[in-house]
Amino acid sequence: MRLHATFAAHVNRYVTIIMDHPRVQAFMAEAKRRNPHEPEFLQAVEEVAETVIPFIESNPRYQGHALLERMIEPERVIQFRVPWTDDEGHIQVNRGYRVEFNSAIGPYKGGLRFHPSVNLSILKFLGFEQVFKNSLTTLPMGGGKGGSDFNPKGKSDAEVMRFCQSFMTELSRHIGPDTDVPAGDIGVGGREIGYMFGQYKRLRNEFTGVLTGKKPAWGGSLIRPEATGYGATYFMVEMLATQGESIDGKTVSISGSGNVALHAAEKCLRLGGKVIALSDSKGSIHDPAGLTEEKLAWIKDLKEVRRGRIKEYADAHEGVTFREGQDPWDLNCDLAFPCATQNELDGDEAATLVANGCKVVAEGANMPCTPEAIEVFHRAGVMFAPGKASNAGGVATSGLEMSQNSLRMSWTAEEVDGHLQRIMKDIHGQCVEYGRLDNGSVDYVQGANIAGFVKVADAMIDQGVV
């Protein structure tokens, strides 16, 4: 692949400048004082501040409004208890959250995550990222995030239903199609969305587009389950096109084996890529021959129906290796999609990826690469797309689902996929516009942050101090 020879040196100088920027340092010192013990949130804020504050200082329109100071404060944080009864008749109690971050350009929009690791720091980080991601789609959606420390794994359908009904009983007070429209995330799929939608309908006596990620039979959009993985792949296509390259013939390594990972793999296969790795929390599989449509269908059944472990794929297929406790980042590949969870790929693993020939990385999960990993990619001249840009396909299609609900009509899969491709192409174009460096290369982190900021900032200025 052709890469700009001076890219790494230019980025090194740029990173040094922004890290030594006194305004950035002062801003982050105050953010840390106000948000102690919230490392994930502060990590997300710092990444944005490092690029947006220099932009503000060079653009008088955005000065004097305390825009970034206001953006990092959620408009509303809701925390509540979620009591429910398990199959043995014992009462269990979990915590529920909804962080309504910013509504300057539309109703709050963002997923619900059910996982034991959920806490306020993680949800604030996700909600803050969502503000910029939703802005990049150009659709009228604000940013929010929510969830619970409930773990659906190992629970019966009846237990999951009772939990979802209890969770929605409180959440229903705070959401609505013109106020806040949640969706799914880790631990929240079609089953959970269905139970919550049913409870909302029961409580409010309204059949309305209050949630996205619904099944098509009752108000959902075609392509929604595939959208995040497909969108990340479409973004990768646009990145490669700037170098005169394509996915065809490239070796692809993907972490995760959930919704995003499997559909990124599916789209890569259809575009001629050779997908050699997937993973879950127990380890990763290496399939040197590459996945096929038949193999991928087997894994989808394993994960979505049987709810099994990726190791079972290695056990059932000759020539496939299961690597217990290992991520796929030490395998030789051309392209990488981190699609599992936040901070899964650190600096050492990034260095290994680079040494093994990886040239382009697109985040499928939210903030899966640590700051150290991103710096390694920049120094090596590896093209890197942050999740707020490359995984925006999911929320973009959620926005399309909202449009279909408002119009009381459904679009074909081809229509939705066409809209998705155009949106991802437009997001890439925005990143290039605001991320173009002096030497002609593109810093996608800078581009995504500034492009996302500008639309929200313009709306906040227009709407006054609220």
Language-model-detected regions and their locations in the chain:
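General beta-strand structural signal in soluble alpha/beta enzymes
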Residues: T179-A183, E206-L211, I254, A277-D280, ...
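Glycine-rich phosphate/diphosphate-binding loop of Rossmann-like nucleotide-binding domains
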Residues: T212-K215, G220-N332
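Generic secondary-structure signature for well-ordered alpha-helical cores
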Residues: K32-P36, E50-R61, F128-F132, K153, ...
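Predominant activation on well-ordered alpha-helical scaffold segments within soluble catalytic domains
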Residues: M28-A29, E46, E50, L120, ...
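Adenosine-phosphate binding glycine-rich loop
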Residues: I18-A44, M239-L240, T352-V466
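Short hydrophobic alpha-helical segments enriched in small aliphatic residues
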Residues: A5-V11, V15
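Rossmann-like adenosine-cofactor binding region
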Residues: G283-F384, A389
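N-terminal ligand-binding/catalytic initiation module
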Residues: I17-I223, K455-A459, Q463
